[in-house]
Design a protein with these regions (language model features):
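A ligand-binding cleft/hinge motif common to bilobed small-molecule-binding domains
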Residues: 96-106, 165, 169-176, 199, ...
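Residue-level signal for nonpolar/aromatic packing positions in well-ordered secondary structure
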Residues: 33-35, 42, 49, 66, ...
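N-terminal (or domain-start) structured segment
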Residues: 24-112, 177-203, 297, 323-326
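Hinge/capping helix and adjacent helix->loop/strand transition within the periplasmic-binding protein
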Residues: 83-89, 103-192, 241, 254-287
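Sec-exported extracytoplasmic/periplasmic mature domains
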Residues: 53, 57, 61, 82-86, ...
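C-terminal lobe and pocket-closing loops
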Residues: 122, 211-280, 309-312, 317
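An extracytoplasmic/periplasmic, membrane-proximal ligand-sensing/linker region
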Residues: 30-32, 265-326
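N-terminal export signals
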Residues: 2, 8-24
């Protein structure tokens, strides 16, 4: 081999050695990622975001920091996700309200305002009362609601026109009452609503039982029923509306992860694959099961189709409930 040839090989080898770190440096993520949560700390959406962030951090080797951006019945946080730079360093957990808010004229955002990454959770609502409430079962509460004056009783659970509000409206209508017979007090999520319930600020809260669990276990509230086809195995003593009232009414919230539109395909694919690993991880399964949160998986394409169906269904439900505008 000539000296020139040897020099050529050495140069090529050095170039290859330099190229390898360059390729590695191009891998996503290279710095911390922000996960925006549109709802308050301690609620089901916040808890789901934080366990996912913790496992993503281990999986992808960079911090994933959850930031709560509340307000506007969910509009503030959902807008922040949609308006983030499409570089993968700000993503978010989006909720069923994104299929509802635009029907009320609160925002122009729809499920198609995002790059879907993965669907990871679905939960039905429960009906909670203060621990000192005279109502020990759902029939007693239902009778009291029917006997009350319009607007006399107050309820909370999420923002105006949010999924837990719609759950209450549907239940009232199923009992033959107007959807606004119980006055809705908007909140930034289930956690602050449950605190308000425990303090006596409202008469009942509709939210998932897992979201209410901390206040219930502290002896400050109790759950009377769930709006689901069957009982939650983590809360076997909480009956369904159908069992107790003969009302076959159920609904639920969903949560998934998304980025802004035009997120690069490589980054979106990396995140969806990582979220799939999170979903199948022991940490996520044990966390969700221990709290009674539902686990539902959909990849990016499945999540997009799921949101389209949810958008149509919520539009129909909100028009029927008189909550839609236009």
């Amino acid at each position: 081999m000539t000296t020139t040839s040897r020099r050529g090989l050495l140069v090529a080898g050095a170039a290859a050695a330099l190229a390898r770190p360059a390729i590695a440096q191009g891998r996503y993520p290279q710095r911390p990622v922000t996960i925006i949560c549109p709802w308050g700390a301690g609620g089901g959406t916040d808890q789901t975001a934080r366990i996912v962030a913790a496992v993503l951090e281990k999986d992808l080797g960079q911090p994933f920091n959850v930031v709560n951006r509340t307000g506007g019945s969910g509009v503030v946080g959902h807008s922040a996700i949609a308006q983030a730079p499409p570089d993968g360093y700000t993503i978010g957990i989006i909720t069923v309200e994104i299929a509802m808010m635009h029907w009320q004229g609160l925002t122009q955002l729809t499920p198609r305002s995002y790059t879907p990454l993965a669907l990871m959770n679905e939960d039905p609502p429960g009906v909670q009362v203060n621990a000192s409430s005279p109502h020990r079962d759902i029939r007693s509460l239902a009778d009291a609601i029917k006997a009350s004056r319009p607007g006399q009783l107050k309820a909370s659970g999420t923002g105006q026109g949010g999924i837990w509000h719609l759950a209450l409206v549907g239940w009232l209508q199923a009992m033959g009452l107007p959807g606004d017979h119980v006055r809705w007090v908007p909140s930034n999520g289930a956690a602050p609503a449950m605190q308000d319930l425990a303090a006596g600020g409202v008469d009942l809260v509709t939210c998932s039982v897992p979201e209410a669990r901390a206040i219930i276990e502290a002896g400050r509230a109790r759950s009377l029923a769930v709006m689901a086809p069957q009982r939650n195995p983590i809360f076997p003593d909480v009956p369904t509306l159908k069992e107790t009232l003969g009302i076959d009414y159920s609904t639920g919230a969903w949560r998934g992860f998304a980025g802004p539109l035009n997120l690069p395909r490589e980054i979106a694919s990396t995140l969806t694959a990582a979220l799939d690993r999170v979903y199948r991880s022991n940490e996520y399964i044990e966390f969700m099961n221990a709290r009674g949160f539902g686990r539902t998986w959909g990849n990016a394409e499945e999540f997009a189709a799921f949101m389209d169906r949810s958008n149509r269904a919520m539009g129909e439900a909100m028009r029927a409930a008189g909550l839609a505008r236009g």
